[in-house]
Amino acid sequence: MHFLLHCWLAILIFCSLDYYFLQETLQHYPENVINPIFLSSDLIVKLKNQVWDNGNAIFQPTSFQISNISSGTGAKNVVPGHLDMLFNFRFSTESTESSLRKEFESIVDSLDFDYEIEWNLSGLPYLTTENTLKDIVVNSIKKEAGIDADKNAKGGTSDGRFIAKMKTEIIELGPLNKTIHQIDECVSIADLELLKNIYLDVLKELN
């Protein structure tokens, strides 16, 4: 069993982007067509190649991902008049919500699109600098599992971002996530039993 111990976490910005071009146009009149799907390809290439930051010793570089793109009415012979894009940033402490928004909008503006953006910040990156809880957890993992924990800032968004506002030490330790968000997501019963023993030892050491 391989343990990943999350002592830090990068948080996501979720966002939707709507492009507005002309009204829907019949493809029979190509001279009147402005296709938002074609035009958005330039933006997608720019966003894919953009380096938002280089990360640091703890955090990976900020990553940008597009999760959904939709356009059109479903008609086979009508060019759509707008395009919707859903995307997110998983950002490190090297960037801020403000800097990413400014940089993103600058890229969109450079392509002369009419657009609307709706931003949604799920939380801010946090960093655990104290070692009391971390050392206890690492020692408990060594005692119960016989392995050295891999301490890193990888992983998804968690409720730890809310507790971090209390300026307390945050450690994330849970089951393996090889099947996370997949069909038939599952964990090993043996892993859960081992995890229970680790939690119990941590509680004893904290008492």
Model-assigned labels for residue ranges:
Residues 3-7, 11, 17-207:
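Metal-dependent amide/peptide-bond hydrolase catalytic core
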